[in-house]
C-alpha cells in the first residue's frame, strides 16, 4: 500500500510517499520512504519573532502542490499509484490544518481513495521506528517540541498512555523564550543550543524545576524567569566589553540547557523504572538537540536501557511521519478511512482519545 502524507500543522509544509511493503515484511521501516518534499517557513516568520498564523496558512497553499509534484518525481510514481491519503488532522493552527485537510480530502475524493486524519503527535511518536535501530513495543516516548513536553507509554500502534506532561511552558517554548531574552535569532532553540556549546558548565546555579517532585510532570516557566533575573543582574553591572558580554551569554545558555537536559533525562529514567520498559524514544523538534542526546546516551550506557531517535531530518515536522503513521493506522484498522467527507480538523486533540479500541 502506498500512502501519501501531508503535514501542515504549523510552519512546515511536508509531503511524502510511503510504501508499507517493507514494514509488512519485517524489513527496516525506512526502506518504505519513496519520496518527500519539505518547505520551512522560518525565514518568513523571522521578522515577527514567531509564527504568524495567517501567513503560515497562505504559504501552505502556495507550497503543497509543488511539494506533491516533487515527491512524485523523486519516487517515479503517478497519482494513480497512490492507495490512500493521510493528513495532519490536529493539533495545530486551525487555518494551517484546514489547508492540509482540504487538499488531502479533495485529492482523495477526486481519486476515489480512502483518507485518514493523523494525530500530529502520533507522527512524532512513531517516527523513531524509521531509524536505523527501531525500538520494540512497549517503549517510553519523551516528546519534546515547541508546543509539547510529554512522557508517554507506547504499547503499540494506537495504544498510548500519558505518564506526565508540562504544567506550563513546553521545553521548546522555554528554549525560544530564553533565546529571545539573550538576544538570539529566531528560531531560538537551535541558536541557544549552539551558543551553549561555547559556555562553561556550572557558572550559574539555575533551578531544575520539579526534578524531585515525585511525579513525571514538568515545569519550565520558573527557569525562564531565573534566566531573566540573571540578565538583569548582569545589566546592572554596566559591563561594556564585548568579550565579557559574549561569555556571559554563552555561560548562561549553557546553564539553561544543562538544567533542562537534567530534568528531561531524570524524568525519562524514572518513567522507565516505573513501567519496566527497556526502550526510550526521543521525538519532536527538541529531539535534535545534541546535548540532550549525549546525556541520554550516557545515562543509557550506565543503566542498561536503549535510546532510539528518528533521523535528524525527521525530528522537525515533516510529511514522512504523517504518511508513515497514517499507513500504520490503516493497516491496524484494516485500511479503513477514519474521516468524514467534511474538511474536519482538530486544533486541540488529546492523543489518548484517538487510541484504537
Swiss-Prot record:
<protein>
    <recommendedName>
        <fullName>tRNA N6-adenosine threonylcarbamoyltransferase</fullName>
        <ecNumber>2.3.1.234</ecNumber>
    </recommendedName>
</protein>
<comment type="similarity">
    <text>Belongs to the KAE1 / TsaD family.</text>
</comment>
<feature type="binding site">
    <location>
        <begin position="143"/>
        <end position="147"/>
    </location>
    <ligand>
        <name>substrate</name>
    </ligand>
</feature>
<comment type="function">
    <text>Required for the formation of a threonylcarbamoyl group on adenosine at position 37 (t(6)A37) in tRNAs that read codons beginning with adenine. Is involved in the transfer of the threonylcarbamoyl moiety of threonylcarbamoyl-AMP (TC-AMP) to the N6 group of A37, together with TsaE and TsaB. TsaD likely plays a direct catalytic role in this reaction.</text>
</comment>
<keyword id="KW-0963">Cytoplasm</keyword>
<dbReference type="InterPro" id="IPR043129">
    <property type="entry name" value="ATPase_NBD"/>
</dbReference>
<feature type="binding site">
    <location>
        <position position="189"/>
    </location>
    <ligand>
        <name>substrate</name>
    </ligand>
</feature>
<dbReference type="GO" id="GO:0005737">
    <property type="term" value="C:cytoplasm"/>
</dbReference>
<dbReference type="GO" id="GO:0061711">
    <property type="term" value="F:N(6)-L-threonylcarbamoyladenine synthase activity"/>
</dbReference>
<feature type="binding site">
    <location>
        <position position="289"/>
    </location>
    <ligand>
        <name>substrate</name>
    </ligand>
</feature>
<keyword id="KW-0408">Iron</keyword>
<dbReference type="GO" id="GO:0002949">
    <property type="term" value="P:tRNA threonylcarbamoyladenosine modification"/>
</dbReference>
<dbReference type="InterPro" id="IPR000905">
    <property type="entry name" value="Gcp-like_dom"/>
</dbReference>
<feature type="binding site">
    <location>
        <position position="317"/>
    </location>
    <ligand>
        <name>Fe cation</name>
    </ligand>
</feature>
<dbReference type="GO" id="GO:0005506">
    <property type="term" value="F:iron ion binding"/>
</dbReference>
<keyword id="KW-0808">Transferase</keyword>
<feature type="binding site">
    <location>
        <position position="120"/>
    </location>
    <ligand>
        <name>Fe cation</name>
    </ligand>
</feature>
<feature type="binding site">
    <location>
        <position position="124"/>
    </location>
    <ligand>
        <name>Fe cation</name>
    </ligand>
</feature>
<dbReference type="InterPro" id="IPR017861">
    <property type="entry name" value="KAE1/TsaD"/>
</dbReference>
<keyword id="KW-0819">tRNA processing</keyword>
<dbReference type="Pfam" id="PF00814">
    <property type="entry name" value="TsaD"/>
</dbReference>
<dbReference type="InterPro" id="IPR022450">
    <property type="entry name" value="TsaD"/>
</dbReference>
<keyword id="KW-0479">Metal-binding</keyword>
<feature type="binding site">
    <location>
        <position position="176"/>
    </location>
    <ligand>
        <name>substrate</name>
    </ligand>
</feature>
<keyword id="KW-0012">Acyltransferase</keyword>
<dbReference type="InterPro" id="IPR017860">
    <property type="entry name" value="Peptidase_M22_CS"/>
</dbReference>
Amino acid at each position: 500500500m502506498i500512502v501519501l502524507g501531508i503535514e501542515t500543522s504549523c510552519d512546515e509544509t511536508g509531503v511524502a510517499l510511503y510504501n508499507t511493503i517493507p514494514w509488512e515484511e519485517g524489513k527496516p521501516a525506512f526502506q518504505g520512504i519513496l519520496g518527500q518534499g519539505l518547505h520551512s517557513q522560518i525565514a518568513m516568520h523571522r521578522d515577527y519573532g514567531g509564527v504568524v498564523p495567517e501567513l503560515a496558512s497562505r504559504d501552505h497553499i502556495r507550497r503543497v502542490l509543488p511539494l506533491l509534484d516533487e515527491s512524485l518525481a523523486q519516487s517515479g510514481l503517478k497519482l494513480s499509484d497512490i492507495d490512500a491519503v493521510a493528513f495532519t488532522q490536529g493539533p495545530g493552527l486551525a487555518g494551517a490544518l484546514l489547508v492540509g485537510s482540504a487538499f488531502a480530502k479533495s485529492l482523495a475524493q477526486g481519486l476515489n481513495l480512502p483518507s485518514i486524519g493523523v494525530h500530529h503527535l502520533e507522527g512524532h511518536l512513531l517516527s523513531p521506528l524509521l531509524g536505523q535501530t527501531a525500538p520494540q513495543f512497549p517503549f517510553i516516548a519523551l516528546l519534546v517540541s515547541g508546543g509539547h513536553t510529554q512522557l508517554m507509554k507506547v504499547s503499540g500502534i494506537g495504544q498510548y498512555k500519558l505518564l506526565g506532561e508540562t504544567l506550563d511552558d513546553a521545553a521548546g517554548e522555554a528554549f525560544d523564550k530564553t533565546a529571545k531574552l539573550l538576544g538570539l535569532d529566531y528560531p531560538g532553540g537551535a541558536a541557544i543550543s549552539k551558543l551553549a556549546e561555547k559556555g562553561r558548565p556550572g557558572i550559574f546555579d539555575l533551578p531544575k524545576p520539579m526534578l524531585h517532585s515525585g511525579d513525571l510532570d514538568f515545569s519550565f516557566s520558573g527557569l525562564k524567569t531565573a534566566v531573566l533575573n540573571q540578565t538583569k543582574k548582569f545589566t546592572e553591572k554596566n559591563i561594556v566589553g564585548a568579550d565579557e558580554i559574549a561569555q556571559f551569554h554563552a555561560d548562561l545558555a549553557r546553564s539553561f540547557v544543562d538544567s533542562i537536559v537534567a530534568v528531561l533525562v531524570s524524568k525519562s529514567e524514572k518513567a522507565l523504572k516505573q513501567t519496566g520498559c527497556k526502550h526510550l524514544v526521543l521525538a519532536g523538534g527538541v529531539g535534535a538537540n545534541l546535548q540532550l542526546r549525549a546525556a541520554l546516551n550516557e545515562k543509557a550506557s550506565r543503566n542498561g536501557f536503549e535510546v532510539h531517535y528518528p533521523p535528524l531530518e525527521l525530528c522537525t515536522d515533516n510529511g514522512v511521519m504523517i504518511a508513515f503513521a497514517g499507513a500504520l493506522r490503516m493497516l491496524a484498522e484494516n485500511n479503513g478511512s477514519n474521516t468524514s467527507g467534511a474538511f474536519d480538523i482538530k486544533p486541540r486533540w488529546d492523543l489518548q482519545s484517538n487510541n484504537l479500541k
